[in-house]
A protein has these predicted regions:
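Hydrophobic residues within well-ordered alpha-helices
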Residues: 7, 59, 138-140
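Acceptor/aglycone-binding surface of glycosyltransferases and processive sugar-polymer synthases
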Residues: 17-32, 37, 49-128, 154-177
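Cofactor-binding loops of NAD(P)H-dependent oxidoreductases
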Residues: 17, 41-43, 148-150
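Acidic donor-binding/catalytic loop of UDP-sugar-dependent glycosyltransferases
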Residues: 2-6, 41-58
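Residue-level signature of catalytic and energy-coupling elements of molecular machines
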Residues: 3, 29, 44, 114, ...
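Acidic donor-binding segment of Leloir-type glycosyltransferases
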Residues: 1-16
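A charged, well-structured terminal subsegment
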Residues: 180-184
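Catalytic donor-sugar/metal-binding loop of nucleotide-sugar-dependent glycosyltransferases
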Residues: 101-102, 123-126, 135-153
Length: 184
């Protein structure tokens, strides 16, 4: 609710989506968007959106999906030890094996993609596992995927994170194993 208020205050068109969840919000935004490319990113000030030129350049070169890669550019205190050295690397390894892709940071919160190509994938995960679903479906479709380095800064928001490490990690792993979303 606060993110939507702040976005409106800065001139963004905010799309209201009835179903709760990270994936639901993004799918609703993708459907409502009007541009050729979509750059999505966490709104907690942990990413520098002035750096999106690299994403757009790769998309213009014909890549369907462009992933950010936080590793090598993580500010001190921006990611917990367990996420940096256990959760993200292990889930990304499982995703690389399952989807035969080189993406090393499956959970980077900033990425770009071709809107029409994304719509054609039939994305349906309502929760955090959407982050894995979109990579898996782009990889399986044969679309070209690029990865570019990004910096991760400390979270700048005042509120608490919506991330629930164990349940969300399980949902990602479950999607990788079964290739289907958990339905509520």
């Amino acid at each position: 609710v606060r993110s939507a208020f702040i976005a409106r205050e800065h001139g963004a068109r905010v799309v209201n989506v009835a179903e709760k969840g990270y994936g639901s919000a993004l799918i609703g935004g993708i459907k409502a968007a009007q541009g050729k490319y979509i750059i999505m990113g966490d709104c907690d000030m942990s990413y520098d959106f002035s750096d999106i030129g690299g994403f757009v350049q790769k998309l213009r070169e014909g890549y369907g999906l462009v992933m950010g890669n936080r590793f090598g550019g993580i500010e001190r205190g921006a990611m917990s030890f367990s996420h940096r050295y256990i959760g993200v690397p292990l889930l990304s390894l499982a995703g690389r094996i399952r989807y035969h892709t080189f993406v090393t940071d499956f959970h980077c919160g900033i990425r770009g993609f071709d809107r029409e190509k994304a719509l054609a994938l039939g994305l349906s995960c309502s929760g955090m596992e959407f982050a894995t679903e979109i990579i898996g479906k782009f990889a399986r479709s044969g679309e070209k995927i690029a990865q570019i380095p990004v910096k991760l800064r400390r979270d700048g928001r005042n509120g608490r994170s919506h991330l629930r490490s164990i349940p969300d990690g399980w949902r990602h792993l479950r999607f990788i194993i079964t290739n289907s979303c958990e339905k509520k």
